[in-house]
Amino acid sequence: MQETYIEEILKELTLEEKIGMIHGAGLFRTEGVERLSIPPLYMSDGPMGVRAEFADNEWRNVGTTEDYVTYLPCNSAIASTWNRALAKKAGEVLGEEARGRGKDVILAPGINIKRSPLCGRNFEYMSEDPGLIEELVVPMIEGIQENDVAACVKHFAANSQETERLWVDTIIDETALEEIYFPGFQAAVEKGHTLALMGAYNLLNGEHCCMSKSLLNEKLRKDWAFDGVVISDWGAVHDTKLAAESGLDLEMDVKYQFDEQYMAEPLLKAVKDGEIEESLVDEKVRNILRMMLRLKMIGPERKHRKTGAYNTEEHRRAVLDVARESMILLKNEDQVLPLQAESGCKVAVIGANAAAVHSNGGGSAEIKALYEISPLMGIKKLLGGNVKVSYAPGYVIPDKKEASEINWQAASTETAENTEKESTVSGRTLDEKQQEALAEAVALAKASDIVIFVGGLNHDFDVEGLDRVNMKLPYGQDEVIDALLKAVPDTVVCMYAGAPVEMPWAEKAKAILWSYYAGMEGGTALAEILSGKVNPSGKLAETFIRDASQCPAHTIGTFGKKDRVEYREGVMVGYRYYDTKKTDVLFPFGHGLSYTAFTYNDLEIIRQQENGRQTVKVSCSVTNTGEHAGKETVQIYVAPEQKKDRPVHELKAFEKVRLDAGETKRICVILEERDFSRYDTDKKMPVPVNGTYEIQVGASSTDICLCGKIDLFFAEG
C-alpha cells in the first residue's frame, strides 16, 4: 500500500521536480511540489534543543521571539545517566519541540565514538563504548519519532575529530569498524528504525562518506536494509556522479547558490545528457517520499499528524530529571558532601563557570534557551533564606567574539586552528587581572564556612570546528583550585564541561562533582546534589585519563592530522585499552559514587537455550547498605579466556536500579551469542567463539564485585 502510493506520486513528478526535492532550496529546507501537495522538508540542528530560526539564504538568525526553546542536557550528559527511560524522555522533548516549531527532521542525536578526549564535539556524543551507545540511542530515536519528526542520526561514520574534518582520510580496519564504529549506527537503523541519517564530512578509507558506495550502498542499504533518507552534512558533497551513484538522498550545503549544488542543476544536466540514469534520482525521491509518508506529511494520515509543543512545564521537568541523574560524584572523602549549610553560615561560590551560561555556543548545538539556571543561581535559589551566598569569579576569561555571532556552518568548509594569544583586560595584562581575581577568591574562601568552586570548560573549547590542543584547564584554574584547597581543604570542586580535563589537584581535593552541560535546569540539579536533596547516580560513559598522552589514539594511532588519520589502535578504544594495559587512569569507565553504599551478592550464571540459540542468564542481588535511598548502575562485562589481541573485557549489559535504604533487589540480564562473538573478516560477520568466559559484575570497569566462569560451545564456533 505504502510503496504503491509512492510509485503513483513518482510517476506524476517531472525530472525538474524530482531534482528539486533532493537538494537544499534554503539553508534548512528543501523544495516542495505544490501541485502534488508535497511540502518542503524543514530541518533543524538539535542536539541540545531546536536551533533558532535562520534566514533562508543567509547565515543569520531572523531575530524572532518565537524560537526560544527548552535547553536539553548534551548527549554526554544523557549517556552519563545510564538510563534508557531518560534517554527516551529526552528524545520525546526534542521531538515534540521540533514539531512545535514546524520541523520535520531534527539533526540529532550524534553518536560518534569518543576516540580522543580532545575532539571538539565530544559533548555532542555519548560514549567511548558502542554497546552503551546502542542501548541509549534506540530509545532516544523512539522518543523523537513518536512525535512525527524524523531523527537524523549523525555523523556516519568515524567523524571523531574536527581538525580538517572536510578532507581528512580516516583509516580504520574492518574489525574496528564492525565492532566499534558501526554498531551504534546499525542499532539506530535496525532497532531504532531511524528515518534519517547524516553522512559525515570526512573520508573513510579513501572515500568521502557522503559519496561512498561501500558505506552507503553496501553497508547501510544492503547489509542493514535501510530505506530511510541519507542527508549530507552541510557542504560534504564534492562530485555529482559519485553522489548520484551513492546511497545519498539529499544534498545540503552552507552556500546560498542552491541551484549550483552537485545534486541540483549539474545533476539535472547530467541526466538529460544521458550521463546519469534517471532511475538513480527516482530512488532518492522514493526514499524521501517514504519518510514523508511515515511522518504523515503526505498521504491519508496527513490530517492526523501531531502538532507538537515547546517550552512546556512537562519539558522543563523532564530536562531536570535528566540533569539530576547525569551528574557524577567522582570523589567524596570524609563525607564532605552533601553539604551541611546551617542557618547563618556563609557559602562562597567561586569560579567563572558558576555564573556562566552555555546554551548560546558550541556551533550547530547552540540554541536560544527560554532560560538557563547557572550553578550560582541554583545554589542561591535552593539555599536562599538564612544562608549567605557570596560569589567571586576566581579567574578571568578573555573577551572573545560571542558564540552566537560566529557563522559556524558558513565557516565549516574552512580550516580553523586553536591558538592562544596574549590578552589585556581594562589596560592591564591578563596575568595581572588573574592575580587580582585569585586573591579576591582566596580571601572570600577564608571568610566562609563552605567553599564551592565551579570551573571547567566552555564553548570556546567544546566547539564545532576545533579540537582542543590538550586537556588542561584554561584560564589558570589549576592555580585557583590549588590555592583554594590550601586555604580551605574541604573546598568542593565542581567541574562543568563537555569533555575530560586534567586534574593535577585531584589527590588533594576531597570532593569532586562532575557535570556535563546539563541544560536549562543544570544549576538546579547541581545545587540539589550538593545539598543532598538529590542523591547522585551518574556514571562515567568515558574514561577520565590523566592527560592525552595516555590515550591510544595519540600514542598508537594518530589524531588531529590534517590529511590522513590512522586508527592503528583498532578495537582498543577507551577502557578496552586502559583496562587491558592496566593504565593508571584518573577515573575509570563506569565510575560514579553515591551518598549511600551498595553491595553485590549471590551471582548466578546459567546457560540456556532460547529460540534455538544459546544464551547466558546472569543474575545477582544488590543491596543498599547505606542510610539514603539511591540508584546504582550494575554493569556486566564479559572477559574471554583467550585474550590475544583482544580487550581484557567488554561491557555487554547494564541495569540501573533504585533502592531504598536497606532494600535488596535481584538484577537479571540475558547475554546472547553476539555478546560472545568476534567479527570474522572472512565470513564478513560476527561469529561466536567457543571457550571459557569470565562474567564480571561491578560498579565500574575496574570495580568488579562479583565474577564467575562459564564454558561455552557454539555450533558456529
State where each predicted segment sits:
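Glycoside hydrolase catalytic-domain context in secreted enzymes
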Residues: 1-681, 685-702, 709, 714-717
